[in-house]
Amino acid sequence: MLVIWLLLLALLPEPRVPAATASPRAPRDAGGRGGVYEHLGGAPRRRKLYCATKYHLQIHPGGKINGTLEKNSVFSILEITAVDVGIVAIKGLFSGRYLAMNKRGRLYASENYNTECEFVERIHELGYNTYASRLYRTVPSGASTKRKASAERLWYVSVNGKGRPRRGFKTRRTQKSSLFLPRVLDSKDHEMVRLFHTNVRYRESLLKPPSKNQRRRRGR
């Protein structure tokens, strides 16, 4: 079923991305707390992004982005906030960092919110979403402005079959690695969130850099 849907999706034209507009002042936070986006309303959606490659997207406090096969990983709990029409910012609840894509198409975890943290959220059939950089894309050279706009290729958030992020310019919206299912938090996730907000030792243990053995066990 997924294969048939992907073939149908490949026939559709690339979505047009709203252009980034200059803001009179830099937002302090994309979550509607004292920033310029508070008028867009509502608390962030707390979700886990489950890729069609079977990995949950993780945002680490050290700046790393990857995927995990763990069902309940603290760094896979995310806050997704609307910052413009069809545009979202994705923040790791436990790491406090934003998902971002640089001009080389690499995903990283940014300490501060900036335009590289803005992604076009597109909801597809079967419940899968795609997230494309608002700022960066592949634009063909040597073509007219009108043809360039129609031939632009978006750069997507993508996690491959080994849990590693793919560079944006190598991605396509029809690839399994670019499809994400937003999952609501389960009871264990909610308990981890509660401990994070109420237990100082628990919070400090999570934010402490992992040892070599811990990194080896996490693997992904």
Swiss-Prot record:
Glycosylation sites: 66
Role this protein plays: Plays an important role in the regulation of embryonic development, cell proliferation, and cell differentiation.
Chain positions covered by the region annotation Disordered: 19-40
Lineage, uppermost ranks: Eukaryota, Metazoa, Chordata, Craniata, Vertebrata
GO biological process terms on file: fibroblast growth factor receptor signaling pathway; negative regulation of cardiac muscle tissue development; neurogenesis; positive regulation of cell division; positive regulation of cell population proliferation; positive regulation of MAPK cascade; regulation of cell migration
Protein's recorded name: Fibroblast growth factor 3
Gene (UniProt): FGF3
Signal peptide: 1-19
Pfam families the record matches: FGF (PF00167)
Family: Belongs to the heparin-binding growth factors family.
First-listed, main subcellular location of the protein, grouped into a coarse class: secreted
Keyword annotations from UniProtKB, A to Z: Developmental protein, Differentiation, Glycoprotein, Growth factor, Mitogen, Secreted, Signal
Subcellular location: Secreted
KW Secreted (keyword) present: yes
A single Gene Ontology CC term: cytoplasm
PROSITE patterns tied to this protein: HBGF_FGF
Annotated SMART domains: FGF
GO function terms (MF aspect): fibroblast growth factor receptor binding; growth factor activity
